[in-house]
């Protein structure tokens, strides 16, 4: 059972908002514990006054509850609340942390949550009926990058001798899984299954961990319709562990490594129990991460509310990245609060402010480890959806070959750039964003992407050719049956 945070708007703040909605051109001079004082601005002061935001008329639903998991990439939700962006859009929001990704998805489907911070694979998997079936859509991508892969100290010590060193003795990065492969083989020979953690079967973390392992010659296993463990033919055995539990599970020896979002890789460094060996930025530069998910029914029944919440989230993402991340220290302070991520300020800052610490003391600049708005991070690209679907097919979650057209059709059912651009256009019209901030002319597909760890090119318009180009994984016409891959 989840406990709602004390994040609903107070009566005073709601009263202030109602005054704005009614007054239009009036400007607040106070809006605190006492009565709000209002005065008409003089011509000399209007140039310095921020635009007054008039909420969209006729919002279908204004009292909303959104869910999240305690990870730093939930930041757009926290900032939209703390900076008053939801409020200014006429939305009275409560934020609730969820126990795990399954609970979060189920509560959105059941209507207990109006929307949530989601794994990008969740709306896609639900819509095609892998796991819980429901039509989920996303009008907003929450971020790029933000994950890492950590191994235990013991595993790191066995990997380390084979890794090339720089002149100062530190390891050369990125570190591929080929340096982990002999360790896995040794453990297997000793009768110790090499267990690793990821956060959910359709998570970016699962696919990134699998991508890294496969690029290094380690088989991460297949799924099949009658075996959803994902461990068919696996050399490394991947299983689900909720993000906040990753460090403790590693420390207990239940797993030897994991892939997770922050701050749970940096937590392992601070606790002295593990070493992050690679970030997802190094696996796939500027990869899409989380999305904001709502049911298709919610979007259809509440189009104005959906536009308003998308506006608020875009504004939050802009704030997080503006002035070369100048607001990140404040964002870290907000996220460190118990009602959000609840980790120490220093742990969150270690990755959120443009650095990343690998081995203890080996802190390196990674300015784009977390990206919330730059590089069109918030635009829901169809090609991002296609990549996730390609990985579901690669590992057998999509059991049979599908046409390239099928991938495009699913992407268009789930990813809603039309909603996003409508919200963005209104922000530009209101003077809250610049025309140049948004990709107005895109067809929803990024150009072919080349910056992967294994130098394979991904073209979202040709998913089957991409899948067939990958060394380990299912190819066209192949299925997994009875623990074997057949044509």
Q: What are the roles of these predicted feature ranges?
A:
Residues 27-30:
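C-terminal motif of bacterial Sec signal peptides marking the signal peptidase cleavage site
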Residues 32-35:
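Bacterial signal peptide processing site
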Residues 386-487:
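Conserved C-terminal helix/tail region of periplasmic/extracytoplasmic solute-binding proteins
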Residues 71, 98-102, 117, 200-203, ...:
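Soluble non-cytosolic domains of exported or imported proteins
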Residues 300-418:
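Secondary-structure end/capping motifs
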Residues 149-150, 291-294, 298-299:
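Short glycine- and hydrophobic/aromatic-rich loop-to-beta-strand nucleating segment
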Residues 2-20:
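Bacterial N-terminal signal peptides that target proteins for export
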Residues 39-239, 251-286:
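Short, glycine-/small- and polar/acidic-enriched structural segments
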């Amino acid at each position: 059972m989840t406990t709602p945070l004390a994040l609903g708007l107070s009566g005073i703040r709601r009263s202030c908002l109602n005054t704005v909605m009614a007054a239009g051109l009036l400007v607040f001079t106070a809006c605190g514990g006492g009565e709000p004082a209002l005065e008409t601005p003089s011509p000399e002061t209007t140039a310095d006054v921020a635009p007054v935001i008039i909420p969209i008329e006729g919002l279908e639903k204004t009292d909303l509850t959104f869910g999240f998991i305690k990870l730093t990439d939930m930041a757009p939700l926290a900032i939209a609340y703390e900076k008053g962006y939801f409020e200014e859009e006429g939305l009275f929001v409560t934020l609730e942390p969820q126990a795990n990704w399954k609970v979060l998805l189920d509560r959105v489907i059941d209507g207990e949550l109006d929307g949530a911070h989601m794994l990008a694979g969740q709306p896609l998997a639900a819509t095609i009926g892998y796991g819980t079936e429901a039509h989920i859509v996303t009008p907003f991508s929450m971020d790029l990058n933000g994950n890492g892969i950590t191994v235990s100290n013991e595993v790191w010590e066995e990997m380390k001798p084979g890794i090339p060193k720089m002149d100062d003795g530190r390891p050369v990065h990125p570190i591929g899984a080929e340096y982990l492969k002999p360790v896995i083989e040794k453990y297997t020979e000793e009768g110790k299954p090499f267990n690793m953690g990821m956060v959910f079967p359709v998570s970016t973390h699962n696919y990134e961990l699998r991508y890294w392992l496969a690029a290094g010659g380690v088989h991460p296993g297949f799924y099949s319709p009658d075996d959803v463990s994902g461990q068919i033919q696996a050399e490394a055995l991947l299983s689900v562990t909720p993000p906040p539990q990753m460090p403790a599970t590693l420390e207990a020896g239940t797993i030897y490594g994991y892939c997770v979002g922050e701050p749970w890789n940096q937590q392992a460094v601070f606790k002295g129990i593990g070493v992050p060996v690679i970030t997802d930025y190094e696996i796939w530069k500027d990869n899409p991460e989380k999305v904001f998910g709502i049911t298709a029914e919610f979007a259809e029944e509440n189009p104005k509310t959906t536009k308003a919440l998308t506006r608020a989230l875009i504004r939050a993402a802009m704030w997080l990245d503006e002035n070369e991340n100048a607001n990140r220290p404040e964002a870290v302070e907000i996220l460190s609060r118990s009602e959000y991520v609840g980790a120490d300020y220093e742990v969150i800052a270690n990755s959120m402010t443009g650095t990343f610490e690998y081995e203890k003391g080996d802190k390196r600049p990674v300015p784009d480890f977390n990206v919330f708005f730059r590089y069109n991070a918030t635009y829901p690209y169809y090609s991002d959806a296609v990549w996730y679907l390609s990985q579901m097919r690669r590992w057998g979650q999509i059991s049979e070959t599908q046409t390239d057209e099928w991938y495009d059709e699913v992407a268009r059912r789930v990813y809603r750039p039309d909603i996003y651009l409508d919200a963005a256009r209104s922000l530009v019209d209101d003077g809250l964003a610049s025309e140049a901030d948004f990709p107005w002319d895109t067809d929803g597909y990024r150009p072919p992407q080349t910056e992967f760890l294994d130098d394979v090119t991904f073209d979202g318009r040709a998913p089957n050719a991409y899948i067939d180009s990958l060394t380990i994984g299912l190819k066209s016409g192949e299925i997994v049956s009875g623990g074997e891959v057949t044509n």
